[in-house]
Amino acid sequence: MTTRMKAVAARAAGGLGPPRLRPGPAGRAAGGRPSRLRSFDPGRIADLEYRVWVGYYLRQWPQVLAASVGLVRTGFGMDWYRTLHGAWLVLRANQLWAPFPDNDPDRARACMRRLYALVKLSYGEPANPAKAAALEVDWWRAHREMQHATQPRGTGDELVESVTRLYGYLYGEPEAEVRLAAVHRARAMDLSDQWIREGCRPDSPLLPLEHAALVRCYAALLAAVHH
């Protein structure tokens, strides 16, 4: 991690996210409440992921790192050492995936496996970090193929299915319960892709729509897993 990126991460670390709860059986915290994996702020998560996406496509890596710190902290609620380590892994996975067509999916997958291994150390899940990483990078693949496809996609396309598989595995939920979240996420990606095609204008009216689609994604996901 460069000195500049360390400074960005340190600034981003100021108070993001609630304290970590100790997980109990079946994804529940010790007091019978849903674990931190199943209890999150959809608006906050959506805002941070939106910043990651915009920074990624503009290749503004310090912005990606800063938003990733908040995203990992808010999404997983791990201690700060694991949060900063996890955010760095997210950044590296994105950097390794970004080039087209000569990216490095194997190394990107390895970074995500290490991230999910940190989550497992904190909460005991996902059971298989390598499988979680494979499912994560698989939706990246599906999205990239969609970006370069000549035919428009439908509502039951491979991208929606790949995100559904990831959510179902991470939270141990039936795929039917998390599919709506995947549909909204795919819609956010559609809007992001259109924004890119139109020149990545910072004042584009597509950006608020993309942000709103991510909020709907995480609201639907919370409704499915918060128990």
Predicted regions and their residues:
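Generic helix N-cap/helix-start motif at coil->alpha-helix transitions
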Residues: D41-E49
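Amphipathic alpha-helical repeat scaffolds
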Residues: E49-V54, N94
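Hydrophobic/aromatic side-chain positions at a characteristic register within alpha-helices
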Residues: Y56, W97-F100
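Short, charge-rich amphipathic alpha-helical segments embedded
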Residues: G70-N94
